[in-house]
Every structure is written in C-alpha cells, then in structure tokens.
Amino acid sequence: MKRFLSLGAIALAAAALTGCGLLEEDSTDAESEVSGDQVDAAAEAASGDCLPQEVLSEDPDVFTIDCSDPEAYWSITAIDGDTDATAAAGDLTDYQPAFDLCGEEVGAFLPGKPLTDWNMIYDQVSGEVDYLFCVEAIAEPDEEGRTAVVPAAGDCFSSADATWSTVPCDSELADYSVADVVELELTEHAAADLEAAATECGETVYYELTDLFGRTSALLCVE
C-alpha cells in the first residue's frame, strides 16, 4: 500500500505572509509519496532526529538526516506510531491528536520562538495514520542569515519569505523591522477585535501572526 506525507501546517499557513501558497498548482502525489524504506526508517525515528525543510528526504532509503547536514531544518520533538488519528485529503480529520502529541501551541507563530509544525505518514486509501510526529525548526541561520524563528521586537524580516523567519537587520533581505509586539491570547479573534488591538501600533504597518488553525498570537508593529 502506498503511504503519503501530509502537506503540513507550516506549508499551508505560509500564505498568510506572502499572499500565495507554497503548493504549486502542478504538485502531484508523487512529490509526497513515502517509499517503503522510508516508512520502515520512520519506525526508528526518535525525538532529536532531524529532517529537511521539505520534511521528506530526496533519498528514498532514509527518513531522517544527520543533524549536521546543511539541509537539516527540523528537529523531531515527538513521534507516535500507535495513534488513533485518521486522515483525509492530506489532512487530519481531527486535529486533537496533533495537539495531544505536540502541545496546544503547535503550529502557532509565537514571537521569538522557532517555528513548530506537525506532520504524518498515512495511507491515502484507508486514511490510517501510520506515524504522527511533531517538529521544531532548528534555530540556526542559513547561508543567507535567515533563521526559522518568528520575529520579535527588535528583529528584522523579509516580507518576501515564504514563512516567518528573521534576517540580520543589515541584510539586503530585510525590508521590515519589528518596532513593537502586541501580545494576544492564542485563539481565534474577531476582525473588529484585531483592529482594536492594532491601534496599539499607532500609525505603523502591522502584521497578524495567524496560524493554520485561525489562531492569532500577536500583532507585529513594523517599520
């Protein structure tokens, strides 16, 4: 039976930053299909193991990669091969198993904190989830100085990036700096409430830190 990798929360939520999704129109199942060897290797995966940014390695024989590999982007924080979770159309039918395994803040954009996400290996036909796992971005800058950490006050970022990260403020990539952060309860907020909170930013531009689940953790007041 074929197994597939979920599209993942971070990939879908990235549209909030750029206005366009990471998923190309010509994406195919082949791009997320997990080989039999990778499924077997996932059985040996454990907290602290690393994965590439795309989660699925190009090498069909391995699931995790060496954490010293320049391609290492995610660190596994938890993995469960005995879950009652089910999937449909590349997504969990109920997110509660992900919250139970990864914590309620998984996928949330929290200022000053590394990106987090969940993912799964599942059977596209039966919907059975073989492995559900949680990941946290490795907070180390890449060759361009980009670090997979949500910007906080004093940080700079590029609005052209596919998802939240920080860049050095003297980098040519930086086009915004965070002047202030308006912290909010991590939940869904009505538009009127967000507009009211945004008055704390004064006349400056602001960004909403809203995740896949519709929860907004804060507003970034930028200049």
Residue locations for each model-derived region?
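C-terminal motif of bacterial Sec signal peptides marking the signal peptidase cleavage site
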Residues: 16-19
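Primary mode marks residue(s) on the alpha4-beta5-alpha5 output face of response regulator receiver
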Residues: 21-223
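Hydrophobic helical h-region of N-terminal Sec-dependent signal peptides
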Residues: 10-14
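Bacterial N-terminal signal peptides that target proteins for export
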Residues: 1-9
